[in-house]
Each structure stands twice: as C-alpha cells, then as structure tokens.
C-alpha cells in the first residue's frame, strides 16, 4: 500500500525550485527530491492565426476551454516542413540540368519538331508557307534536297581521311533526286491534310486522341511551331494511311468545332481538277 505525504517547495537563488515529496510504501518511507526550472516559451504566429484562436466555440463545444476536444474533433496527420539549407543550390542545379537537356534536343528549323531539318517531311510545304509570309526571304529548304550524293568510293575515302561527310552523301543514303524517293514523297503528299485555325493548346497527342481517333492508324502528325517561342502557329499537317481515308477525314473535319475554334481542313497540296 502506498501513502503520499505533503510536499515541500523550496525556491533556489538560481531561479529553480526544489520539490521534496515523501512516500510511504510497504511500511518504508521514501524521500523524493526534484529540481525544476520553469521556462516560459513565447510563440509568434501570424495575426490571422491569433485572431482565429479568439473565436468563440459553438454547439457542443460552447464554453469549452481552448484547444481541440478529442470527443468532438478529429485531428489529421501532422506534416512537418523540413527546409534544406542548400535549397537555392539544388534549384540552380535543376535549372542547369534542364537547360543542358533542352540544348541537346534536336529541333527542326521549319516545323520546330524533334528531327533534322533535312529530314522534315513537310519541307516543300513549309517553303511555300515561308514564301507567302516573306517573299524576299531566301529559302534554304531546297539546298539540302537538290544536292546529289557523290560516289560511294569518294565518300568512303572522305570517311577514311577523317573528313565530315553529310548524311545525304554517305554510302547507302537515299538520293533525293531519284524517282523512287520522289514517288514516295508524292504518295505521302497525296494522303496529307493541312489543318488551320487550330487551337494553340492542341499538340500532336491531343489531335491523335481527341480528333483523329476515328480514322485508324495515323502515320504522322506534325504541329507547326514558332522556332523562337516553341508555341503552336495554329497549323498542323496530318498524313493518313491512304488517300481515301484522308478524303473521308477532310469531309468530316472541315468546318467542325474543336477546342472553341472552327477547323479548316484541306489538302496539303491542291489536287488537280479532273
């Protein structure tokens, strides 16, 4: 059996308190001495938080003391915000990494997509658009397309000597002036539509998933972008699997509303009237 006795409190010169308590347990008397220092901590909070703490409680909590009551209040999980000391350095490192990554991406000078300018599938179409926008500007689109590759032996000799050989002049490269290459380009143009008045927020994925999904497999979708800003110019070229599917898409999509704009859909190259 434990019996507690009266306690003694002694104020010390250093500001602490000595609390002496006595306890009798199983016929033995124990003396317990505790030295306590009282520390007053003041917390600075935002004035809006301080004003909310002064709100009067209502309902079942009327006249209740300050603080949450676990019988009527459910507390969420506490989340501690841990700020790093070198957060500024980490932010600069992430910015530098993003810049290096963006500098390494290949960008076409014509349509702004991730491929070389010489391999742009809409080279001839974009040259016509550039000529309409600025008739006095030199067109450099055809400079790579009209050059015929040199002989395989000369390109191999250049490689052996360590000289740079453009891809169009390397062994096995397609001859842009050949009939087969020209026929394949013409077949692509026959099944390619030009979509204008396109919303600037529409990208290739949006067009495939929300606009072109009824027309089966779409080999190529290119949204023309501004070379400086990277924003869409409201123009896109879509190559379909066949000319018949392209004609069906042209009839169904021309004049249709998409993302708050009325689309204008036509052939990328005008068809000859029969």
Swiss-Prot record:
One of its GO terms (cellular component) is eukaryotic 48S preinitiation complex. Residues 191-270 form the RRM domain. GO terms for molecular function: RNA binding; translation initiation factor activity. Residues 172-187 have a biased composition (Basic and acidic residues). InterPro entries: eIF3_g, eIF3g_N, eIF3G_RRM, Nucleotide-bd_a/b_plait_sf, RBD_domain_sf, RRM_dom. Residues 161-187 are annotated as: Disordered. It holds the Pfam family eIF3g. The modification Phosphoserine is found at residue 168. It is found in: Cytoplasm. One of its GO terms (biological process) is formation of cytoplasmic translation initiation complex. It comes from the Eukaryota. Keywords: Cytoplasm, Initiation factor, Phosphoprotein, Protein biosynthesis, RNA-binding. Transmembrane segments: none annotated. HAMAP family: eIF3g (MF_03006). RNA-binding component of the eukaryotic translation initiation factor 3 (eIF-3) complex, which is involved in protein synthesis of a specialized repertoire of mRNAs and, together with other initiation factors, stimulates binding of mRNA and methionyl-tRNAi to the 40S ribosome. The eIF-3 complex specifically targets and initiates translation of a subset of mRNAs involved in cell proliferation. This subunit can bind 18S rRNA. Belongs to the eIF-3 subunit G family. Component of the eukaryotic translation initiation factor 3 (eIF-3) complex. This is Eukaryotic translation initiation factor 3 subunit G.
């Amino acid at each position: 059996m434990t019996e507690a006795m009266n306690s003694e409190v002694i104020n010390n010169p250093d500001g602490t308190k000595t609390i002496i308590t006595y306890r009798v347990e199983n016929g033995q008397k124990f003396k317990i001495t505790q030295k306590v220092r009282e520390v007053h901590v003041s917390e600075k909070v935002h004035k809006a938080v301080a004003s909310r703490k002064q709100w009067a409680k209502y309902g079942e909590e009327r006249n209740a003391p300050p603080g949450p009551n676990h019988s009527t209040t459910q507390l969420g999980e506490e989340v501690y915000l841990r700020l790093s000391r070198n957060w500024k350095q980490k932010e600069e490192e992430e910015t530098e990494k993003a810049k290096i990554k963006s500098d390494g991406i290949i960008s076409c000078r014509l349509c702004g997509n991730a491929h070389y300018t010489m391999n742009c599938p809409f080279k001839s179409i974009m040259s016509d658009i550039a000529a309409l926008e600025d008739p006095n500007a030199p067109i450099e689109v055809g400079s790579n397309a009209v050059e015929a590759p040199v002989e395989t032996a000369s390109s191999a000799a250049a490689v052996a000597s360590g000289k740079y050989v453009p891809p169009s002049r390397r062994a096995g490269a397609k001859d842009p002036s050949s009939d087969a290459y020209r026929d394949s380009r013409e077949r692509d143009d026959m099944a390619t539509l030009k979509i204008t008045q396109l919303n600037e927020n529409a990208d290739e994925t949006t067009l495939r998933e929300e606009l072109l999904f009824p027309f089966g497999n779409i080999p190529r979708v290119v949204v023309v972008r501004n070379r400086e800003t990277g924003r869409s110019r409201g123009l896109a070229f879509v190559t379909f699997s066949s000319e018949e599917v392209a004609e069906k898409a042209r009839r169904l999509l021309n004049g249709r509303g998409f993302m708050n704009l009325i689309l204008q859909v036509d052939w990328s190259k005008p068809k000859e009237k029969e």
